[in-house]
């Protein structure tokens, strides 16, 4: 679809959202005006909204919130909510289906999850000012049984194989190279979905729950293969999340890949309860230490940086991609940073550093309180 339009629309996208507090709307006290202002807003959901179910044993951490908390997402201004998450089935299929229904009842469009695989693969299409925007979502962080199949509920899978390749075969016990690649069946289904949707919409956005959590800069090998394939099949913008930390922004063939948008609004106040757990956290990220001033948000220091991705769509194409630097405070509330806040430059410099570290040549240009992403 390529008929020109004189209209322009804006899209905002953020990473992981997990609300579990007495006053759910308060988590968006500082960002609701920004999210609401966009014509379309997207987020990734990391919790169930249900009073039913029991924790499934195949996941270490389990997230569930009251159904009433879902209204906070609509209050904030979100339209499209990906539920293709490694926590989507934490409390079983009843809680999973409750969440999908609750999102719909609150006026939002769930994505990447459904009562069967066909529903989980189904795109969301939104029209604004004569411009059609299509969304697809896939999950590669998959506890056993969390993916949809046949008539089984779950999220839309993009399963990944991991191989450990010995670098020096003649040296037993030396470090290995970690190789990752997508399962052929899921990968082909994803490409078919994108090609089909490409013919139906003006703008196509694909969301991936993927990557290496908490680790500074590192990207998994499969992210590059999958992200590039998505664009080769017709995707205009890739939104990545799950890592709970910002990752590099890549420009591939003129299209932007946010490898990780980081956390956005995430209630998490769990402290390490054993020396072993403390050591495990530090092995992921050396900044993961308990800070009493951040008792309501006990993620690593690096996880306090986040962004609101912005996309300007003009003449039925993406004409500009940018982001708003933001900081997550000790009450787990994201705050948009002003240009004169020193944390603004710290975040931009952090992204520049990890972008260079991964070998991307993406350029960042500050424009007021936005940062434009340049190829």
Each PLM stretch: what is its role?
Residues 1-375:
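Acidic, metal/ion-coordinating pockets
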């Amino acid at each position: 679809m390529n008929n020109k339009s004189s209209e322009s629309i804006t899209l905002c996208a953020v990473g992981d959202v997990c609300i579990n507090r007495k006053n759910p709307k308060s988590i968006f006290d500082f960002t609701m005006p920004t999210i609401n202002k966009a014509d379309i807003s997207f987020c990734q959901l990391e919790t169930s909204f249900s009073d039913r179910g029991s924790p499934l044993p195949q996941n270490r951490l389990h997230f569930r919130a009251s159904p009433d908390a879902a209204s906070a997402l609509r209050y904030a201004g979100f339209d499209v909510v990906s539920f293709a998450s490694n926590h989507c089935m934490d409390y079983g299929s009843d809680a999973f289906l409750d969440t999908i229904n609750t999102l719909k009842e609150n006026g939002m469009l769930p994505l990447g999850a459904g009562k069967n695989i066909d529903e989980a693969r189904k795109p969301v299409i939104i029209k604004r000012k004569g411009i059609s925007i299509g969304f697809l979502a896939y999950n590669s962080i998959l506890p056993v049984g969390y993916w949809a199949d046949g008539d089984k509920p779950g999220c839309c899978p993009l399963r990944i194989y991991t191989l450990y390749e010995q670098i020096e075969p003649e040296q037993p016990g030396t470090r290995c190279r970690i190789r990752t690649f997508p399962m052929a069946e899921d990968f082909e289904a994803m490409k078919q979905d994108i090609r089909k949707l490409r013919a139906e919409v003006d703008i196509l956005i694909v969301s991936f729950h993927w990557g290496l959590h908490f680790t500074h800069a590192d990207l998994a090998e499969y992210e590059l293969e999958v992200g590039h394939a998505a664009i080769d099949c017709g995707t205009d913008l890739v939104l990545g999340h799950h890592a709970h930390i910002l990752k590099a922004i890549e420009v591939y063939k003129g299209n932007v890949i946010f490898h990780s948008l980081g956390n956005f609004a995430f209630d998490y106040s769990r402290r390490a309860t054993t020396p072993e757990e403390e050591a495990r956290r530090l092995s992921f990220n050396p900044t993961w230490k308990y800070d009493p001033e951040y008792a309501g948000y006990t993620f690593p220091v690096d996880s306090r940086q986040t962004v609101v991705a912005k996309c300007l769509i003009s003449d039925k194409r993406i004409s500009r991609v940018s982001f708003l630097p933001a900081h997550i405070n000790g009450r787990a509330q994201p705050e948009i940073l002003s240009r004169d806040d020193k944390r603004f430059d710290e975040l931009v410099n952090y992204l520049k550093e990890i972008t260079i570290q991964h070998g991307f040549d993406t350029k960042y240009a500050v424009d007021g309180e936005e940062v434009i992403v340049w190829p």
